[in-house]
Curated annotation (Swiss-Prot):
Protein name: Probable GTP-binding protein EngB
Cofactor(s) it depends on: Mg(2+)
Listed GO MF terms: GTP binding; metal ion binding
Gene Ontology process terms (BP): division septum assembly
Record-linked PROSITE patterns: G_ENGB (PS51706)
UniProt binding sites for Mg(2+): S37, T59
All copies of domain EngB-type G, residue ranges: 22-195
GO cellular component: cytosol
Gene: engB
Protein family (similarity comment): Belongs to the TRAFAC class TrmE-Era-EngA-EngB-Septin-like GTPase superfamily. EngB GTPase family.
Residues annotated as binding GTP: 30-37, 57-61, 75-78, 142-145, 174-176
Length: 198
């Protein structure tokens, strides 16, 4: 998809701050510093729309981005960062649970994982959470450029088996460096969104 417009609309922490809109939404989740911001910037053809932080756990709000006036991307705070306090972690959990369980506009989630490593227990927990609430999920296995092409399938198998990926959910090999998987990611997103304008 050609992205001609991408703007941040609001950073929200509670439902009354969510955009008053019927546009479909795609939530983007992933471990702190897994490469989620780089994925968003790459797929939207923007260098710095989402700030890439050297400090994990920096995003503490739900950031809504309006894409081509036709859908919202919702950047969810990264999880699994050890230095976040228990109270912050509890607030984070409540905020995302409220969003995922009450937002009717949510069509699917994108879960970004690092292809180089076996998904963590936090990744498994996040995927299980999404499946518990029957949210269609696209798994973006990023940093594919850091692994020899001949080993991609072996690493993908580990991701699939560790997460116990359900039938119907898609896994896309991705690289924010080379752009590998960009078209496939958009195809998967359009498959789940109510808007079919490619």
């Amino acid at each position: 998809m050609k992205v001609t417009k991408a703007d941040i609309v609001i950073s929200a922490v509670k439902p009354e701050q969510y955009p008053d809109s019927d546009l479909p939404e795609i939530a983007l989740a992933g471990r702190s510093n897994v490469g989620k911001s780089s994925f968003i910037n790459k797929i939207l053809n923007r260098k710095k729309l989402v700030r890439i932080s050297s400090k994990p756990g920096k995003t503490q709000t739900l950031n809504f981005f309006l894409i081509n006036e036709m859908m919202h991307f919702v950047d969810v705070p990264g999880y699994g960062y050890a230095k976040v306090s228990k109270s912050e972690r509890a607030a984070w959990g409540k905020m995302i649970e409220t969003y995922f369980t009450t937002r009717e506009q949510l069509d699917a989630a994108v879960l970004v994982v690092d292809l180089r490593h076996q998904p963590t227990s936090d990744d498994v927990m996040m995927y299980d959470f999404l499946k518990h609430y029957e949210i269609p999920t696209i798994i973006i296995a990023t940093k594919a450029d850091k692994i020899p092409k001949g080993k991609w399938q072996k690493h993908l198998k580990v991701v699939k088996e560790t997460l116990a990926v359900e039938i119907g959910d898609e896994i896309v090999l991705f690289s924010s460096e080379t752009g590998l998987g960009k078209e496939e990611a958009w195809k998967a997103i359009h498959k789940f969104t109510k808007t079919k304008n490619a």
